[in-house]
Swiss-Prot record:
Its EC number is 6.1.1.-. Its cofactor is Zn(2+). GO terms for cellular component: cytosol. It is an enzyme of class 6 (ligase). This is Glutamyl-Q tRNA(Asp) synthetase. GO terms for biological process: glutamyl-tRNA aminoacylation; tRNA modification. It comes from Neisseria meningitidis serogroup C (strain 053442). ATP binds at residue 237.
Length: 295
Protein backbone atom coordinates (compact mmCIF):
# COMPACT_ATOMS: atom_id res chain seq x y z
CA UNK A 1 0.00 0.00 0.00
CA UNK A 2 1.14 3.53 -0.82
CA UNK A 3 2.36 5.35 2.29
CA UNK A 4 3.52 8.94 1.95
CA UNK A 5 4.53 11.52 4.51
CA UNK A 6 5.03 15.21 5.23
CA UNK A 7 7.92 15.92 7.57
CA UNK A 8 8.27 19.57 8.63
CA UNK A 9 10.93 20.85 11.00
CA UNK A 10 9.74 23.06 13.89
CA UNK A 11 12.51 25.60 13.38
CA UNK A 12 9.85 28.04 12.22
CA UNK A 13 6.27 28.33 10.98
CA UNK A 14 4.93 26.94 7.71
CA UNK A 15 5.29 29.19 4.65
CA UNK A 16 4.18 29.01 1.02
CA UNK A 17 6.92 26.52 0.10
CA UNK A 18 5.85 24.26 2.97
CA UNK A 19 2.25 24.44 1.75
CA UNK A 20 3.28 23.43 -1.76
CA UNK A 21 5.09 20.36 -0.40
CA UNK A 22 2.21 19.43 1.90
CA UNK A 23 -0.37 19.82 -0.87
CA UNK A 24 1.63 17.84 -3.44
CA UNK A 25 2.51 14.99 -1.10
CA UNK A 26 -1.09 14.84 0.15
CA UNK A 27 -2.58 14.85 -3.35
CA UNK A 28 -0.17 12.17 -4.55
CA UNK A 29 -0.93 9.93 -1.58
CA UNK A 30 -4.70 10.31 -1.64
CA UNK A 31 -4.97 10.03 -5.44
CA UNK A 32 -3.21 6.67 -5.15
CA UNK A 33 -5.52 5.50 -2.36
CA UNK A 34 -2.66 5.74 0.11
CA UNK A 35 -1.92 6.88 3.63
CA UNK A 36 -0.43 10.29 4.44
CA UNK A 37 1.65 10.53 7.60
CA UNK A 38 2.94 13.59 9.44
CA UNK A 39 6.32 13.39 11.14
CA UNK A 40 7.86 16.25 13.13
CA UNK A 41 11.60 16.40 12.43
CA UNK A 42 12.59 17.92 15.77
CA UNK A 43 16.17 16.64 15.91
CA UNK A 44 17.95 19.89 16.70
CA UNK A 45 16.49 21.54 19.84
CA UNK A 46 18.82 24.59 19.79
CA UNK A 47 17.38 25.60 16.39
CA UNK A 48 13.73 24.98 17.20
CA UNK A 49 11.16 27.74 17.72
CA UNK A 50 9.12 27.33 20.92
CA UNK A 51 5.55 26.39 20.05
CA UNK A 52 6.30 25.84 16.36
CA UNK A 53 5.37 22.14 16.33
CA UNK A 54 1.85 22.71 17.67
CA UNK A 55 1.41 25.73 15.39
CA UNK A 56 2.39 23.63 12.36
CA UNK A 57 -0.21 21.00 13.21
CA UNK A 58 -2.88 23.65 13.80
CA UNK A 59 -2.03 25.22 10.43
CA UNK A 60 -2.29 21.89 8.61
CA UNK A 61 -5.71 21.30 10.17
CA UNK A 62 -6.85 24.81 9.26
CA UNK A 63 -5.94 24.14 5.62
CA UNK A 64 -8.02 20.95 5.61
CA UNK A 65 -5.26 18.34 5.77
CA UNK A 66 -6.14 15.05 7.47
CA UNK A 67 -3.28 12.70 8.33
CA UNK A 68 -3.35 9.02 9.18
CA UNK A 69 -2.36 7.76 12.62
CA UNK A 70 -0.55 9.73 15.28
CA UNK A 71 2.04 12.39 14.54
CA UNK A 72 5.55 10.97 14.95
CA UNK A 73 8.17 13.09 16.72
CA UNK A 74 11.81 12.33 16.01
CA UNK A 75 12.75 13.56 19.49
CA UNK A 76 10.87 10.53 20.87
CA UNK A 77 12.52 7.99 18.57
CA UNK A 78 16.13 8.03 19.76
CA UNK A 79 16.02 4.32 20.68
CA UNK A 80 15.28 3.49 17.04
CA UNK A 81 18.24 5.57 15.88
CA UNK A 82 20.54 3.97 18.46
CA UNK A 83 19.48 0.50 17.30
CA UNK A 84 20.07 1.51 13.68
CA UNK A 85 23.56 2.81 14.42
CA UNK A 86 24.36 -0.37 16.37
CA UNK A 87 23.48 -2.45 13.32
CA UNK A 88 25.89 -0.41 11.22
CA UNK A 89 28.60 -0.71 13.89
CA UNK A 90 28.15 -4.49 13.98
CA UNK A 91 28.53 -4.59 10.20
CA UNK A 92 31.78 -2.57 10.44
CA UNK A 93 30.42 0.22 8.25
CA UNK A 94 30.93 3.15 10.61
CA UNK A 95 33.78 4.62 12.62
CA UNK A 96 34.31 7.27 15.32
CA UNK A 97 35.57 10.65 14.15
CA UNK A 98 37.31 13.07 16.52
CA UNK A 99 37.91 15.82 13.95
CA UNK A 100 36.51 19.25 14.63
CA UNK A 101 34.81 20.86 11.65
CA UNK A 102 37.46 23.57 11.54
CA UNK A 103 40.14 20.89 11.75
CA UNK A 104 39.21 18.92 8.63
CA UNK A 105 37.57 21.60 6.50
CA UNK A 106 40.81 23.59 6.34
CA UNK A 107 42.24 21.05 3.88
CA UNK A 108 38.98 19.86 2.30
CA UNK A 109 37.53 20.56 -1.12
CA UNK A 110 33.96 21.48 -1.92
CA UNK A 111 31.58 18.82 -3.21
CA UNK A 112 27.90 18.46 -4.02
CA UNK A 113 26.71 19.49 -0.55
CA UNK A 114 29.42 21.46 1.22
CA UNK A 115 32.92 20.21 1.99
CA UNK A 116 33.95 16.61 1.24
CA UNK A 117 35.30 14.87 4.35
CA UNK A 118 38.92 13.89 3.75
CA UNK A 119 38.89 10.64 5.73
CA UNK A 120 41.30 11.67 8.48
CA UNK A 121 39.73 9.29 11.01
CA UNK A 122 38.72 6.55 8.59
CA UNK A 123 41.51 4.12 9.46
CA UNK A 124 41.92 2.92 13.08
CA UNK A 125 45.04 4.32 14.72
CA UNK A 126 45.49 6.98 12.06
CA UNK A 127 44.93 9.71 14.64
CA UNK A 128 45.05 9.44 18.45
CA UNK A 129 41.66 9.93 20.10
CA UNK A 130 41.53 12.99 22.38
CA UNK A 131 40.86 12.13 26.01
CA UNK A 132 37.37 12.88 27.30
CA UNK A 133 35.95 13.96 23.95
CA UNK A 134 32.92 12.22 22.48
CA UNK A 135 33.35 11.37 18.80
CA UNK A 136 30.99 11.80 15.92
CA UNK A 137 30.17 8.63 14.00
CA UNK A 138 30.62 8.52 10.23
CA UNK A 139 29.71 5.89 7.66
CA UNK A 140 32.21 4.75 5.04
CA UNK A 141 30.93 5.49 1.55
CA UNK A 142 31.77 3.61 -1.65
CA UNK A 143 33.65 4.96 -4.65
CA UNK A 144 30.76 4.30 -7.02
CA UNK A 145 27.65 5.99 -8.31
CA UNK A 146 24.42 5.81 -6.33
CA UNK A 147 21.59 6.72 -8.67
CA UNK A 148 17.82 6.61 -8.95
CA UNK A 149 14.97 7.71 -11.19
CA UNK A 150 13.10 10.64 -9.68
CA UNK A 151 9.40 11.04 -10.40
CA UNK A 152 9.86 14.69 -11.42
CA UNK A 153 13.54 15.37 -12.09
CA UNK A 154 14.35 12.09 -13.86
CA UNK A 155 17.71 10.36 -13.52
CA UNK A 156 20.04 11.57 -10.75
CA UNK A 157 23.28 10.08 -9.40
CA UNK A 158 26.25 10.88 -7.17
CA UNK A 159 29.58 9.24 -6.54
CA UNK A 160 29.48 9.48 -2.76
CA UNK A 161 33.25 9.21 -2.27
CA UNK A 162 33.89 12.04 -4.73
CA UNK A 163 30.87 14.26 -4.14
CA UNK A 164 30.08 13.83 -0.42
CA UNK A 165 32.67 11.84 1.55
CA UNK A 166 32.04 9.75 4.65
CA UNK A 167 29.11 11.49 6.32
CA UNK A 168 28.01 11.90 9.93
CA UNK A 169 25.25 9.78 11.46
CA UNK A 170 25.67 10.88 15.10
CA UNK A 171 27.15 14.27 15.90
CA UNK A 172 29.83 14.79 18.52
CA UNK A 173 27.37 16.90 20.55
CA UNK A 174 25.08 13.87 20.84
CA UNK A 175 22.42 14.94 18.34
CA UNK A 176 21.36 12.51 15.64
CA UNK A 177 22.06 13.49 12.05
CA UNK A 178 19.16 13.97 9.66
CA UNK A 179 20.36 11.33 7.18
CA UNK A 180 20.25 8.46 9.68
CA UNK A 181 17.02 9.55 11.36
CA UNK A 182 15.04 9.98 8.16
CA UNK A 183 16.10 6.58 6.79
CA UNK A 184 15.31 4.81 10.07
CA UNK A 185 11.93 6.55 10.32
CA UNK A 186 10.90 5.92 6.72
CA UNK A 187 11.75 2.23 7.06
CA UNK A 188 10.03 1.80 10.42
CA UNK A 189 6.91 3.66 9.28
CA UNK A 190 6.69 1.73 6.01
CA UNK A 191 6.98 4.83 3.82
CA UNK A 192 6.84 3.83 0.14
CA UNK A 193 6.70 7.22 -1.60
CA UNK A 194 8.46 10.48 -0.72
CA UNK A 195 7.34 13.76 -2.31
CA UNK A 196 9.49 16.66 -1.09
CA UNK A 197 11.43 19.73 -2.25
CA UNK A 198 14.38 19.68 -4.61
CA UNK A 199 16.63 21.09 -1.90
CA UNK A 200 16.69 17.50 -0.57
CA UNK A 201 17.57 15.92 -3.92
CA UNK A 202 21.27 16.10 -3.03
CA UNK A 203 20.62 14.08 0.15
CA UNK A 204 18.84 11.22 -1.59
CA UNK A 205 21.87 9.14 -2.73
CA UNK A 206 23.13 9.15 0.87
CA UNK A 207 19.76 7.93 2.07
CA UNK A 208 19.61 5.23 -0.61
CA UNK A 209 23.09 4.04 0.38
CA UNK A 210 22.00 3.81 4.02
CA UNK A 211 18.91 1.87 2.96
CA UNK A 212 21.16 -0.55 1.07
CA UNK A 213 23.44 -0.96 4.09
CA UNK A 214 20.46 -1.66 6.35
CA UNK A 215 18.68 -3.93 3.90
CA UNK A 216 15.47 -1.89 3.91
CA UNK A 217 13.34 -0.95 0.88
CA UNK A 218 14.07 2.24 -1.05
CA UNK A 219 10.96 4.41 -1.46
CA UNK A 220 10.02 6.06 -4.73
CA UNK A 221 11.13 9.69 -4.75
CA UNK A 222 9.69 12.79 -6.41
CA UNK A 223 11.40 16.12 -5.77
CA UNK A 224 9.23 19.19 -6.22
CA UNK A 225 10.36 22.49 -7.75
CA UNK A 226 11.44 25.07 -5.22
CA UNK A 227 9.73 28.42 -4.87
CA UNK A 228 12.35 31.15 -5.19
CA UNK A 229 12.40 34.89 -4.60
CA UNK A 230 13.50 37.54 -7.08
CA UNK A 231 17.14 36.90 -6.11
CA UNK A 232 16.82 33.21 -6.98
CA UNK A 233 16.93 32.13 -3.33
CA UNK A 234 14.66 29.38 -2.03
CA UNK A 235 11.68 30.69 -0.08
CA UNK A 236 12.46 29.53 3.43
CA UNK A 237 12.73 30.64 7.03
CA UNK A 238 16.30 31.75 6.30
CA UNK A 239 15.17 34.05 3.47
CA UNK A 240 12.37 35.43 5.64
CA UNK A 241 9.46 33.78 3.84
CA UNK A 242 6.32 34.99 5.64
CA UNK A 243 4.27 32.52 7.66
CA UNK A 244 1.02 31.32 6.11
CA UNK A 245 -1.90 33.67 6.72
CA UNK A 246 -4.84 31.59 7.95
CA UNK A 247 -7.22 34.31 6.76
CA UNK A 248 -6.10 33.60 3.15
CA UNK A 249 -6.30 29.82 3.12
CA UNK A 250 -8.32 29.45 -0.09
CA UNK A 251 -6.19 31.99 -1.97
CA UNK A 252 -2.95 30.33 -0.85
CA UNK A 253 -4.13 26.85 -1.82
CA UNK A 254 -5.12 28.11 -5.27
CA UNK A 255 -1.71 29.75 -5.53
CA UNK A 256 0.23 26.52 -4.89
CA UNK A 257 -2.15 24.60 -7.19
CA UNK A 258 -1.12 26.96 -10.00
CA UNK A 259 2.56 26.36 -9.22
CA UNK A 260 1.88 22.61 -9.51
CA UNK A 261 0.14 23.12 -12.89
CA UNK A 262 -3.25 22.00 -11.63
CA UNK A 263 -6.24 23.40 -13.55
CA UNK A 264 -8.25 26.22 -12.02
CA UNK A 265 -10.32 25.02 -9.07
CA UNK A 266 -14.03 25.84 -8.67
CA UNK A 267 -15.19 28.49 -6.24
CA UNK A 268 -15.48 27.37 -2.62
CA UNK A 269 -14.69 28.82 0.76
CA UNK A 270 -13.78 25.45 2.28
CA UNK A 271 -10.08 24.46 2.14
CA UNK A 272 -10.91 20.76 2.53
CA UNK A 273 -13.02 20.88 -0.65
CA UNK A 274 -10.12 22.46 -2.52
CA UNK A 275 -7.81 19.68 -1.35
CA UNK A 276 -10.34 17.07 -2.46
CA UNK A 277 -10.46 18.75 -5.84
CA UNK A 278 -6.65 18.71 -6.07
CA UNK A 279 -6.63 14.99 -5.26
CA UNK A 280 -9.15 14.31 -8.03
CA UNK A 281 -7.13 16.29 -10.60
CA UNK A 282 -3.59 15.40 -9.48
CA UNK A 283 -1.07 14.63 -12.25
CA UNK A 284 2.59 14.27 -11.24
CA UNK A 285 3.63 14.40 -14.92
CA UNK A 286 2.49 18.04 -15.12
CA UNK A 287 4.53 19.26 -12.13
CA UNK A 288 7.30 21.65 -13.29
CA UNK A 289 10.86 20.33 -13.14
CA UNK A 290 12.49 23.66 -12.38
CA UNK A 291 12.21 26.37 -9.73
CA UNK A 292 9.17 28.64 -9.74
CA UNK A 293 9.42 32.36 -8.92
CA UNK A 294 6.07 33.73 -7.71
CA UNK A 295 5.09 37.12 -9.22
Amino acid sequence: MYTGRFAPSPTGLLHIGSLLTAAASYADARSNGGKWLVRMEDLDPPREMPGAASHILHTLEAFGFEWDGEVAYQSRRYALYEETLCRLKTAGLVYPCHCSRKDWQAAARRGADGFVYNGRCRHPGQRPAPQGKQPAWRIRVPDRDIGFSDGIVGGYAQNLARDIGDFVLLRADGYWAYQLAVVADDAEQGVTHIVRGQDLLVSTPRQIYLQQCLGVPTPQYAHLPLLTNAQGQKWSKQTLAPALDLNRREQLLRQVFRYLNLPEAPETDRPAELLDWAVAHWDMDKVPKHAVTPP
